[in-house]
A protein has these predicted regions:
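Phosphate/Mg2+-binding loops and adjacent switch elements
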Residues: 99-174
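N-terminal phosphate/diphosphate-binding loop that engages ATP/GTP or pyrophosphate donors
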Residues: 23-81
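Phosphate-binding/switch loop-helix module in NTP-utilizing enzymes
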Residues: 77-108
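Conserved lysine of the Walker
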Residues: 17
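Phosphate-binding P-loop
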Residues: 1-4
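Hydrophobic anchor at the beta1->P-loop junction of P-loop NTPases
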Residues: 9
């Protein structure tokens, strides 16, 4: 089995992170790689409905972990005290992934591709002064004047996805077994 690679897609709110994760995932799947994703949420997830069986298992029954098995999909709800890092999450839940695309987790030590739109703020998250600046491997932006010591792609272009997928694959963190 191939080693698992991980790369993080970071950016400010509404900068296009999810759109890029989806596009990269689709391109890598097209290449026949087994792709899985991790999404970092900033607020409590509320996917269950009050009074439904799984909600009752979790809230009334106080179950630590609930697995919902349905036709074509599986959902796991798990109580946790502390936030896990993306590498631990991948090791625990994403066995068999060849590439894990991580949306968010900016402060974790993973190679990063940033989405930066000027409407989201005057500056990207990356700056040369950041102590972790070397973790950035590429940027996609609408700022035609932006320059960096790594590849910079423009949202307005249409031919960069294949190249960016190559960069993601080549520069991703390879998890040791």
């Amino acid at each position: 089995m191939a080693a698992t690679r991980m790369i993080s897609i970071v950016g400010k709110k509404d900068a296009g992170k999810t759109t890029l994760v989806v596009a990269l995932a689709a391109e890598l799947v097209r290449r026949k790689f087994r792709v899985m994703t991790i999404k970092h949420g900033t607020h409590a997830a509320d996917w269950d409905q009050r009074g439904k069986d799984t909600w009752r298992h979790r809230h009334e029954g106080k179950a630590e972990r609930v697995v919902l098995e349905a036709p074509g999909e599986r959902v796991v709800w798990e109580r946790r005290e502390l936030e896990s890092d993306p590498i631990s999450l991948a090791r625990r839940y994403l066995d068999g992934a060849e590439m894990v695309l991580v949306e968010g987790f900016t402060d974790h030590a993973l190679p990063k591709i940033e989405t930066y739109r000027q409407a989201c703020g005057p500056d990207p998250i990356w700056s040369a002064e950041r102590p972790d600046a070397e973790q950035w491997v590429a940027m996609v932006t609408d700022n035609a004047k932006f320059r960096a010591p790594f590849p910079v792609f423009r949202f307005s272009d249409t031919a960069w996805l294949v190249t960016l997928a190559n960069i993601a694959w080549d520069r991703a963190l390879i998890l040791p077994p």
